[in-house]
């Protein structure tokens, strides 16, 4: 439940829910599990801000354990599609698809707060009981394609080659803000708003 915000304007008092008020300042929140309805909302906000001013920066604050690959990729594809630069700030956790979104920000403008964490790993998948063997082979093939696609995105976003990414995503690979910076997924660590970030 979001608190309401009341502002005094030239037209009188105006009331907003908090995300709508943040949107006025070109701030987008990616909070919680990445799923279709959340992704639709994020994509709509990005397209709205792009239509308002395609040259002005958008700030995206991320705290997400990940979720649906297709929902997450709809967000990252939109981030790359629009002309407006998207700055990403990880607060709390970016895991799984959350890391794909966070690393898809404008290079040079991808940040973490000092106590935030990053987690990369393979996409999850599995067959439902009773699934035919041929269907299981199709699922396995699709999972391999998805893994390869996500690994390429991570390699392009970092200072690491595809072989290193593939090895590190074989199991859960946790990183602190400092480790994420050294890995190349982010460009700086923010400790105070308005102050210069810690960089390499």
Curated annotation (Swiss-Prot):
Pfam families: CLP_protease
Keyword field contains Cytoplasm: yes
Top-tier EC class: hydrolase
EC annotation from Swiss-Prot or TrEMBL: 3.4.21.92
Key words of the record: Cytoplasm, Hydrolase, Protease, Serine protease
GO terms classed as biological process: protein quality control for misfolded or incompletely synthesized proteins
Coiled coil (UniProt feature): none
Ion transport found in the keyword field: no
Xref: PANTHER family: ATP-DEPENDENT CLP PROTEASE PROTEOLYTIC SUBUNIT
Protein name: ATP-dependent Clp protease proteolytic subunit
Provenance organism: Leuconostoc citreum (strain KM20)
Name of the gene encoding the protein in the UniProt record: clpP
